[in-house]
Amino acid sequence: MEDALLGAMTGPEDELGAELFGSERVFADGLALSPAGGAADRDELPVLADAYLGATEPGEPLLRALSPPPGAEVPAALLGDFPGLPELRSPDDAAPPPAYSVHVLSSLLPGARGPALLPLSAGVRVIPVEIKEAGGSVPGGSPEDAAFQAPLAQESCCKFPSSQEAEEASSCPRKKDSSPMVICQLKGGAQMLCIDNCGARELKALHLLPQYDDQSSFPQSELPKPMTTLVGRLLPVPAKLNLITQVDNGALPSAVNGAAFPSGPALQGPPKITLSGYCDCFSSGDFCNSCSCNNLRHELERFKAIKACLDRNPEAFQPKMGKGRLGAAKLRHSKGCNCKRSGCLKNYCECYEAKIMCSSICKCIACKNYEESPERKMLMSTPHYMEPGDFESSHYLSPAKFSGPPKLRKNRQAFSCISWEVVEATCACLLAQGEEAEQEHCSPSLAEQMILEEFGRCLSQILHIEFKSKGLKIE
């Protein structure tokens, strides 16, 4: 019973179908929508008013929303009824309004092999920016050429404001003289859509090179990569856009414009292995900056570099001078020195510091650290000679600082008369004098005087013996 009653009732779809396909309305002939004159009833479906779809008058046909069939001509009277729309074209030339979806022709999307249909709010990050106007306009004939020929210049820059400034800019879009725009960046940093706030008339699509750690992870596509993604209607924008994005480590990627893209060899290659030699900062004479030499955040890369060096040479970080065999008196060479200007007679020479001669495995130039070297013999025979490493600033030990060997007197004794026996006898005499002053209960000042007099007597005897041995007379 209930099913029969419900089946007899007509719904809104049946009424709409009867109105469109009735005897009074021939849908196949006119292909026009029903007029939306007057206020719509609650039972009827409302008609959306849009810049391209809208009602003119109750008795007149509407602008077709769908594309006309092939071979059909569009009457010019329909286009003349809308003088307020700028540059209104036929449905074939006019792009669809920026309403609900965007066709993204990108091969960088994961799992995509061709055009993909994405919602406008899916995977899109909105970045409000301000573009400073340039001095001249963009030359070019067609709108697409003008959009492609907008180069990146230094005099124009792209300012990324903070969140508070972005809210103020969105509330007052025409507050400043510069034309505010909104950049919608797809997730992954592959594309950027520049959208003007004042409307959807000025749309630009730009590409940004994504920063990949390894070029092997760069997604490939069988289809040719498009230069730009054309969305909506492209009009010449009298401004030059300069996009600069700074990565965390401080390096700036190369600027990319819409017309010229770097070729394959110009792309960033895999990261270089550090510690393979001197870093670029050290070779240029600067302090380390933005490199992975001494940064804890690059500890994994440093460990990999050390492991790679040890795989090539297990003794890469070992000292050049190793220990000799058990019972050996001298050290042995393990790598040798590589001196250029010092002649291997300075403390920074590994062989000289280890007190050994240079050998055939050394790579030094103009070496003077060998057994019969006159410079080395003269350096060893100098009175100011010190052991290597005893004095840090031993620049005066260089043979160039000496005019010749020191002149020695013929009557110079090879040894002195002051020996350990003489020192012990002198100390015994001083102790005996102190005990004598203590037994006599002398004052401290008198005891010091007696000890000093005894020391003078002992010293005079030593000098008398010294002068007598040299044949000198004492007056």
Swiss-Prot record:
Give the matching PROSITE patterns: CRC
Gene Ontology terms, cellular component aspect?
cytoplasm; male germ cell nucleus; nucleus
- Please name the source species: Mus musculus (Mouse)
Residues with the modification Phosphoserine, per the entry, are: S34, S67
Intracellular or extracellular location(s): Cytoplasm; Nucleus
Described function: Essential for normal spermatogenesis and male fertility. Required for the completion of meiosis in male germ cells.
- Any Gene Ontology biological process: male meiotic nuclear division
Q: Which family does it belong to?
A: Belongs to the lin-54 family.
Residues forming the CRC domain are 263-372
Origin organism lineage = Eukaryota, Metazoa, Chordata, Craniata, Vertebrata
- Protein's name according to its UniProt entry: Tesmin
